[in-house]
């Protein structure tokens, strides 16, 4: 009787380990775009993000003349493409877009805070947040003109 309990225990442990590794492997194979929830979820986050920026007195002046509908579309396409989705960003490059705006490091950091707040609103996981920020972060050098 004792021998069979040990076998059952070992079998359960092996099955649990196999199942866990399969789930982990499956999650790792999914693109960031898929893990974010696709274009609909990205659209929701971007809309919230733009709202956050509009309410943020530290940086909303940079956007006073922006076409918010066009900005929304470009940001959705940019995040979708950057995260491995099927969208294509067709807007201007970041250096051209921000030339002469005198964006400061503090303003850029405030923008990132507003993005993180939008991601948090939709309970985006830490891994996905970190990956998205890592993909978008290199744009800083083309956006910030005043360190």
Regions found by a protein language model. Give the residues of each.
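N-terminal secretory signal peptides that target proteins for export/translocation
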Residues: 1-4
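Sec-dependent N-terminal signal peptides
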Residues: 6-16
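Core of compact, soluble alpha-helical bundle domains
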Residues: 26-147
């Amino acid at each position: 009787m004792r021998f069979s309990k040990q076998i059952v225990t070992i079998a359960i442990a092996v099955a649990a380990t196999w199942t866990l590794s399969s789930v982990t492997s499956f999650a790792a194979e999914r693109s960031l775009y898929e893990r974010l929830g696709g274009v609909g979820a990205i659209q929701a986050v971007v809309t919230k993000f733009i709202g956050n920026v509009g309410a943020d007195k530290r940086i909303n002046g940079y956007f006073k003349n922006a076409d918010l509908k066009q900005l929304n579309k470009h940001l959705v396409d940019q995040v979708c493409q950057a995260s491995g989705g099927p969208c294509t960003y067709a807007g201007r490059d970041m250096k051209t877009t921000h030339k002469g705006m005198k964006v400061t490091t503090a303003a850029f950091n405030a923008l990132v805070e507003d993005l993180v707040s939008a991601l948090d609103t939709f309970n985006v996981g830490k891994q996905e947040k970190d990956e998205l920020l890592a993909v978008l972060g290199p744009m800083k050098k083309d956006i910030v003109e005043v360190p």
